[in-house]
Amino acid sequence: MDLSDIRREYTRGGLRRNDLPDEPLPLFKKWLQQAIDAKIADPTAMTVATVDESGQPFQRIVLLKHFDRDGFIFYTNLGSRKALHLSHNSKISLHFPWHAIERQVHITGEVEKLSSLEVMKYFTSRPKESQIAAWASKQSNRISARQALEGKYLELKQKFAQGKVPVPTFWGGYRVKINSIEFWQGGENRLHDRFIYSHESSHWNIDRLAP
């Protein structure tokens, strides 16, 4: 399979230093809203990268559920591979691939676990089917067949048919405290625009990176 000629030109315009705010969140919010307005599929989907104890990286797609000055939030099974990695190494990387609007955002940081109150508030806002699925899946564990997972789901669906679904003790969330955030805008002739915000003490440094 020859992939060498699969490429396209980027024509949507550049990104200039004078257009950047002093802090990264206003620009992220603007770009995310533009991704939503452009009807990009799953605009809040982000690649989450962690490393195991041997240094082997792993990636998976997770949905961003909230962001503010305190960090970026996502939820997961605390028995999952990503959670195990983060228990040994709190460093993490997030990546938003908004190809349709010729943009990417890359974030590095460290995680902290969310409080039980924050977890409960979000869990109870989920559809009941999703709440039950959280109970049914021992995420990242090997299973014999899909039928085993579906059978467990149906069993729990019957168990929780009446009343509320409690928050599993093995389910939680993380807040990513940002160390850096890079904004990438596609440019003509592969002269892409890249700016990185690096957090130092109480301020952000902004640097242009070569494409």
From Swiss-Prot:
InterPro entries hit by this protein: Pyridox_Oxase, Pyridox_Oxase_CS, Pyridox_Oxase_N, Pyridoxamine_oxidase_dimer_C, Split_barrel_FMN-bd
Binding of substrate: at which residues?
R7, R8, E9, Y10, K65, Y122, R126, S130, R190, L191, H192
Residues bound to FMN are 60-65, 75-76, 81-82, 104, 139-140, 184, 194
Q: How is the cofactor bound?
A: Binds 1 FMN per subunit.
Q: Is Manganese one of the keywords?
A: no
The enzyme's E.C. designation: 1.4.3.5
Described by its record, this protein's role is as follows: Catalyzes the oxidation of either pyridoxine 5'-phosphate (PNP) or pyridoxamine 5'-phosphate (PMP) into pyridoxal 5'-phosphate (PLP).
- Cite the record's note on assembly: Homodimer.
Name the record gives this protein: Pyridoxine/pyridoxamine 5'-phosphate oxidase
Q: Which gene encodes it?
A: pdxH
